[in-house]
């Protein structure tokens, strides 16, 4: 009898639990799962606007022969390969410096470093475009101290335009990642570092062989989120180049290309859906590789 009552009670709580989460599941299904599945079906069609016909792998053939897609893919990979390691390294170093209990005004420094990620995207884009213009403060400063002989075309030269985008997103998101590392560092027992110091381990050794291994779960998390964010890079490129991805498509990313295919050029929803699944595939593969590289080895 008691067993039957416990079983009934468990079933009651199970049903109640599902009823509580049912509205959230329904909303997720309507606003997330359905668009994902719909875009997958849409990628099997070709045409302009809503005048579509089934083509199977037609969009994949178009993708393979599309030079603009390959340019956007190359730019996205460059941003990922260059920017993410720089940002993660800087965030780690800043967190280690701010974790020093002897550092004065650490709260002020934390606020200053974190502030860019909560600043207005449009405002900071306008500020960066002004600072890095031909007669902006950056060029004037570099000219004044003799580093360059003529102004750099930060917004007009393909190479320097990429550099500017990398500088901008690194400036904006380094503080965001630093907060995660700082929170993790403050949960590490200081006696571990004191013992290592007594044993004669230098500061770089304590950082490399104590701090980094203990922060591995947080590093994995921030690396994956940064990877996803960089592969979906859109905001900075759109605001800096007014949606063109210029000069000469040198800053065009996959996300901006999808936007242009959908809203800027003659609508090609099905082809845009196909390109979007390239981002999904890249995120899945890179996330798996990062999880695999960070796995616990016996």
From Swiss-Prot:
The lineage of its organism: Bacteria, Pseudomonadati, Pseudomonadota, Alphaproteobacteria, Hyphomicrobiales. Belongs to the binding-protein-dependent transport system permease family. MalFG subfamily. Pfam families: BPD_transp_1 (PF00528). One of its GO terms (biological process) is transmembrane transport. It comes from Rhizobium radiobacter (Agrobacterium tumefaciens). Coiled coil: none annotated. PANTHER family: ABC TRANSPORTER PERMEASE PROTEIN (PTHR30193), INNER MEMBRANE ABC TRANSPORTER PERMEASE PROTEIN YCJO (PTHR30193:SF37). This is Lactose transport system permease protein LacF. Disulfide bonds: none annotated. Residues 73-290 form the ABC transmembrane type-1 domain. It is found in: Cell inner membrane. The gene is lacF. Keywords: Cell inner membrane, Cell membrane, Membrane, Sugar transport, Transmembrane, Transmembrane helix, Transport. InterPro entries: ABC_transporter_permease, MetI-like, MetI-like_sf. The chain crosses the membrane at residues 17-37, 77-97, 112-132, 151-171, 208-228, 269-289. Part of the binding-protein-dependent transport system for lactose. Probably responsible for the translocation of the substrate across the membrane. Induction: By lactose and various galactosides, and subject to catabolite repression by glucose, galactose and succinate. In strain AR50 the expression of the lac operon is constitutive.
């Amino acid at each position: 009898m008691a067993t039957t009552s416990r079983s009934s009670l468990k079933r009651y709580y199970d049903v109640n639990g599902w009823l509580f989460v049912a509205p959230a599941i329904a909303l997720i299904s309507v606003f997330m799962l359905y668009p994902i599945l719909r875009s997958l079906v849409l990628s099997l069609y070709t045409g302009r606007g809503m005048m579509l016909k089934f083509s199977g792998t037609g969009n994949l053939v178009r993708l393979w022969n599309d030079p603009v897609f390959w340019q956007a893919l190359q730019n996205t990979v460059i941003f990922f390969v260059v920017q993410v390691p720089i940002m993660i390294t800087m965030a780690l170093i800043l967190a280690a410096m701010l974790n020093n209990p002897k550092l004065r005004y650490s709260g002020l420094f934390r606020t200053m470093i974190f502030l860019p990620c909560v600043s207005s995207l449009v405002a900071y884009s306008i500020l960066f475009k002004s600072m890095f213009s031909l007669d902006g403060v950056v060029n004037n400063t570099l000219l004044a101290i003799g580093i360059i002989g003529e102004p750099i075309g930060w917004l007009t030269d393909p190479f320097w335009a990429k550099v500017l985008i990398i500088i901008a997103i690194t400036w904006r998101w380094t503080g965001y990642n630093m907060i995660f590392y700082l929170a993790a560092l403050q949960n590490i027992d200081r006696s571990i570092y004191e013992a290592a110091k007594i044993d004669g381990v230098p500061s770089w050794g304590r950082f490399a062989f104590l701090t980094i291994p203990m922060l591995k779960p947080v590093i994995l998390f921030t690396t994956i989120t940064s990877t996803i964010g960089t592969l979906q890079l859109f905001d900075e490129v759109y605001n800096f180049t007014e949606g063109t991805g210029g000069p000469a498509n040198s800053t065009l990313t996959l996300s901006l290309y999808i936007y242009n295919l959908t809203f800027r050029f003659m609508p090609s929803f099905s082809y845009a859906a196909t390109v979007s699944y390239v981002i999904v595939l890249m995120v899945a593969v890179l996330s798996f590789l990062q999880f695999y590289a960070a796995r616990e080895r016996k």
